[in-house]
Amino acid sequence: MHLAPHERDKLLVHLAARLARERMDRGLKLNHPEAVALITDHVVEGARDGRGVSELMKSGREVLTAEQVLDGVADMVREVQVEATFPDGTKLVTVHDPIN
């Protein structure tokens, strides 16, 4: 199987998000890369499901709370920008202050 670089990146983000979910299920708090991967995966999969940009910008803020991440992570993640593929093309989705 041959994957383009952007396809490998999407697969890596999905794998990191899956690992983050497994760690959350075990009661662990997420670190910075895990938190960003989980939010990114939420946006990418939401776009694939046909959800709109503004809806994903809002719902991306509801993926994680400050209690679910390690100390300092919420302060480090001020925004997450994701290029996601929508039915009408690729768009940049920015989730501001994603961890509340």
UniProtKB/Swiss-Prot annotation:
Subcellular location: Cytoplasm
Pathway assigned to this chain's UniProt record: Nitrogen metabolism; urea degradation; CO(2) and NH(3) from urea (urease route): step 1/1
A Pfam family: Urease_gamma
A GO-annotated cellular component: cytoplasm
EC id: 3.5.1.5
GO biological process, one term: urea catabolic process
Hydrolase keyword on record: yes
Keyword DNA-binding applies: no
CDD domains: Urease_gamma
Single annotated GO MF: nickel cation binding
Chief localisation class: cytoplasm
Catalysis performed (reactions): urea + 2 H2O + H(+) = hydrogencarbonate + 2 NH4(+)
Keywords, alphabetical: Cytoplasm, Hydrolase
Subunit structure: Heterotrimer of UreA (gamma), UreB (beta) and UreC (alpha) subunits. Three heterotrimers associate to form the active enzyme.
Matches recorded under NCBIfam families: PRK13241.1, urease_gam
Annotated HAMAP family: Urease_gamma
Sequence similarity: Belongs to the urease gamma subunit family.
Name under which the protein is recorded: Urease subunit gamma
Source species: Saccharopolyspora erythraea (strain ATCC 11635 / DSM 40517 / JCM 4748 / NBRC 13426 / NCIMB 8594 / NRRL 2338)
